[in-house]
Amino acid sequence: MVRMPQIAPGQTLLFDADDTLWENNVYFERAIAAFISCLDHHEYTPAEVRERLNEVERETIHTHGYGLHSFTHSLLLCFERLSPAPMAPTHMKDEKRRQILGFARAIAEQEIELLPGVAETLAELSTRHRLILMTKGNHAEQADKLARSGLGSYFSAVEIVAEKDPATYREVIGRHNSELASCAALEFWMLGNSPRSDINPALAAGLNAVFLFHKHTWVLEHTALDPVPVGQQLIELDSFAKLCAIF
């Protein structure tokens, strides 16, 4: 049995939001499945359509950022690229667009579903540590999800950023470090489900990290975990509730 470390009180814990605190990507996956079925492409297989959509999403991120608005744009753009030209009659194409917008609207209307143990764990951790929410995406979308989650009172600050890279992590810890002059970078921890956005860049910025595995993590966030720099820590967990035994 692997012995978990015991971390002293007084840490600053930065929490990711989507697929760390609440379900998120599973709803996008449902929309993608519906999109592929709606497209019913006669040349590309469903797997090939999905790969084309992934390519479009990678492009769209650079111009539209992350979030539902960007995703909707990607669906429509992918539809335009893969639709036969000309596609007749026109009203059929318009109907497809309406269906695609409906897939996105279903995500927007989805109730927030907290992951198991999240509320209770945050409540306990907040008595021993400083908790900060650090999520990327559209500011209005993420702020709305936080408000609907009922978790806002557990966080002393909220950081909604355009991208999570080492420079952003350094900026965030620098801003909050000024509030506690004695707090070192190694007393900051990033906790999340994404190796690409939560773990690797946080380690590169000098933080410790906790990788919280989620089986539905967005494919564009998939990558191998980087080696842990000397003097830093990386903890891997399969359950949010296990945090209380460590922190």
Placement of each model-derived feature along the sequence:
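Substrate-recognition element of Asp-dependent hydrolases with the DxDx(T/V) motif
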Residues: 89, 94-113, 118-149, 158-164
